[in-house]
Design a protein with these regions (language model features):
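Catalytic domains of lipid- and phosphate-ester/thioester hydrolases
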Residues: 1-205
Length: 205
């Protein structure tokens, strides 16, 4: 609806595969190539990005670079994009696991009014943000308006819960409609296959 002057604009849905840094690098390479052959118009046609693991990291990085280019004009060269996304994550992370988990398990960090343990997830995020040179201090809510106004494609993450294997649908947009199951098909005992992150933590900040 935000594509002005185009009667029926094309719409693109991306699904990326997992596979660690190789998948992240491949995703960035493919998106960069698609942009080049469409005269940097590919993301303007893309509505939704979803997928798994490394592919989503690569797609998220490319999307963030696209947004940064729109907002501030700052851009990385093609080679720098690929170098940043393929920078080593495992060695620093393995070192942090070996040292932090054994010796510094009780180190904390503050986030607003809350305090959390510095675990491997914290280290992973710090290393990734440093490698990519983007995302610093970004939160899910920061993408509500850019996605809503079609500046960037919507990203939908769908990790599984440990307890029962259901998918948690994570997006900056309200997507509860994806969690609905028809009770007629379930003997009037609905069992929701998906859980929306935003609805689950609606009362939390």
């Amino acid at each position: 609806k935000n594509q002005k002057g185009v009667k029926k604009p094309k719409i693109v849905f991306l699904n990326t595969s997992g596979g660690g840094l190789r998948s992240a690098l491949w995703t960035v390479h493919v998106l960069n190539h698609l942009d080049s052959i469409t005269k940097n118009n590919f993301f303007n046609l893309t509505h939704l990005i979803t997928g798994a693991s490394g592919g989503m990291i690569g797609a998220g990085f490319y999307r963030e670079h696209f947004l940064e280019k729109i907002d501030s004009g700052n851009i990385f060269s093609t080679n720098e994009l690929k170098e940043r996304i393929s920078s080593d994550l495992l060695n620093p992370l393995a070192f942090s696991i070996a040292t932090t988990d054994m010796f510094f398990r009780f180190k904390k960090f503050d986030d607003g009014n809350y305090q959390y343990t510095k675990d491997r997830g914290w280290f992973f995020e710090k290393i990734l943000v440093k490698n990519l040179g983007l995302f610093n201090q970004k939160r899910l809510k920061d993408y509500v308006l850019p996605e809503y106004n079609s500046k960037i494609p919507i990203m939908l993450f769908a990790p599984s819960t440990v307890n029962d294997g259901r998918r948690i649908l994570i997006s900056s947009q309200p997507i509860s409609f994806l969690c609905y199951n028809d009770s007629i098909l379930l003997n009037d005992n609905p069992s929701f296959e998906n859980i929306e992150y935003g609805a689950l933590f609606n009362e939390n900040n």
